[in-house]
Design a protein with these regions (language model features):
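PLP-dependent aminotransferase class I/II
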Residues: 10, 22, 39-44, 49-55, ...
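Conserved active-site segment immediately N-terminal to the catalytic lysine
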Residues: 157-192, 219-224
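Short beta-strand-to-turn element immediately C-terminal to the catalytic PLP-Schiff-base lysine
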Residues: 181-182, 196-201, 241
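Phosphate-binding glycine-rich loop
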Residues: 32-79, 93-96, 103-105, 170
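Hydrophobic/aromatic ligand-binding patch that stacks against planar heteroaromatic rings
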Residues: 92-94, 147, 171, 188, ...
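PLP-dependent aminotransferase-like
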Residues: 70-159, 166
Length: 288
């Protein structure tokens, strides 16, 4: 039986090798390894792609989650709703800002939070909902946004599985107050190593994160508040710019494979098969 890898990083890099190596040579020539033109260009291109005012690169998706929570004022004494199948990084981020995670049951049809249980878990201490678009399937955003608005809950999206996913024609990552993306090696939009991006339409949140990722430095060597060392370097920005150009094409291929897999497995009653999303949802099938 042939060995078919789940992900072939070599082939993926070969497709962009010429563009990436050319970009690397330019970075080496300028010796501008951090906070250079490739980072700024990627942030502009990704914000345009998602449909938000701001995109901010950072070191990894976990850092993105921590900084997003802090920028939204989440901290000690607050509760954050989180679906029970979320990745450990979501739990860790809530823990590290001093808040309390409150787990919500999972809806097996959407892999997102069960909305009835979500409503039951809301208390006066509930500050935010950290919503994961699991496996690349957009969550039930209309109902979730209505719940958040009614109870005054901040919506923070974890779209690490969902680069390019759409809900009613609008990109995931543009619905919440802020959204977080991991661009690690196995993600749909992947760097050659760890990387992350934060998107938002909120100018104040964007400003906080922009300085938070560089030790709280509003001016060089002048830290106005405690921050982090969480920068997206120029080399990773070169790679992500190249990959972003073909992201929609790659996601469409994933949808085609998912549909063929669903059809081929549909006659096995004992097998739970990834359900087809609603017609107004466009999944990117990070996992099937």
């Amino acid at each position: 039986m042939p060995n078919i890898p789940l992900l072939d990083l070599r082939r993926g890099f070969a497709e962009i090798e010429e563009e990436v190596l050319s970009g690397f040579k330019e970075v080496f020539a300028t010796q501008k390894l951090l906070n250079g033109k490739n980072l700024l260009s990627f942030e502009e291109e990704f914000a345009r792609y998602i449909g938000t005012k701001h995109a901010l690169g950072c070191a990894c998706g976990t850092d993105a989650l921590v900084m997003a929570l802090l920028a939204c004022g989440v901290g000690r004494g607050d509760e954050v709703l989180l679906q029970a199948n979320a990745f450990i990084a979501d739990f860790e981020a809530i823990h590290w800002v001093g808040a309390e995670p409150v787990f919500v049951d999972v809806d097996p049809k959407t892999f997102g939070p069960d909305l009835d249980d979500l409503r039951k878990k809301i208390t006066p201490k509930t500050k935010a909902l950290l919503l994961v678009h699991m496996y690349g399937d957009p969550a039930d955003l209309d109902e979730i946004l209505e719940i958040c608005e009614r109870f005054g809950i901040i919506l923070i999206e974890d779209a690490s599985h969902a680069h390019g996913a759409e809900y009613k024609g609008k990109k995931v990552g543009s619905f919440g107050k802020v959204a977080c993306f991991s661009c690690g090696p196995v993600k749909n939009l992947n760097a050659l190593g760890d990387a992350g991006v934060i998107t938002t339409n909120d100018d104040e949140v964007a400003s906080k994160i922009r300085y938070m990722r560089v030790h709280g430095q509003v001016e060089k060597n002048h830290s106005h508040f405690p921050g982090f060392n969480s920068r997206l370097d120029e080399l990773q920005a070169v790679i992500l710019r190249a990959r972003l150009k073909t992201l929609d094409e790659k996601n469409e291929k994933r949808r085609e494979i998912a549909q063929k897999s669903r059809e081929g497995l549909s006659d096995i009653p004992e097998l739970f098969v990834h359900p087809a999303p609603a017609p107004y949802k466009k999944s990117v099938y990070h996992r099937f």
